[in-house]
Amino acid sequence: MKYDIAIIGGGPAGYTAAERAAAGGLKTVIFEKKAMGGVCLNEGCIPTKTLLYSAKLLDNAKGAAKYGIAVPDGISFNLEKIIDRKDKVVKKLTGGVKQTVKSYGAELIEKEAVITGEDNGLIQILAGGEKYEVTYLLVCTGSDTVIPPIKGLSEIDYWTSKEALEMAALPKSCLLYTSPSPRDRSLS
């Protein structure tokens, strides 16, 4: 199958590029091996903000009495339902991204794309057993979690942000380790 442009990666950069390319009249294909929407939609911005909203509602309910609002004693939460709501929000938005990309006329291939070479000026890509030939290639692979090389870390049970978003129960305690942003590092 021949295309004018292929985009590898279905995060914000990739799906926006696919929409714009297709809207501009280019025969467009976009490949995503995990989940459309990238880290922001699936493991970052959206799910964390959805969980944060539930936490804010709980906090507001606990402090409602000082505003003259009576609430029952023993306000509690159901973590399973909170996680389920987060999953539904992510699923809805992921579906919206897929539909939008397709509505512009881009073809979405939910398989890993492998660049196999070039032939007669066309870039060769293999995905899901199918061959694709493209004139232009845009690689938008996004980001992934980096596990720091801390001695002994592999000997303990630890979570990355991905596991934290899927927790089945709250831990009794935890230690958060984050790295500074590149901007913060340049200030030191």
Which role fits each region the language model picked out?
Residues 177-184:
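Conserved small/polar residues in nucleotide/adenosyl-binding loops
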Residues 10-11, 33, 179:
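Glycine-rich Rossmann-fold phosphate-binding loop(s) that bind the pyrophosphate
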Residues 2-3, 19-26, 31-170:
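Glycine-rich flavin
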Residues 14:
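N-terminal Rossmann-fold NAD(P) dinucleotide-binding loop
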Residues 1-10, 172-176:
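Beta1/beta-strand and adjacent pyrophosphate-binding region of the FAD-binding site
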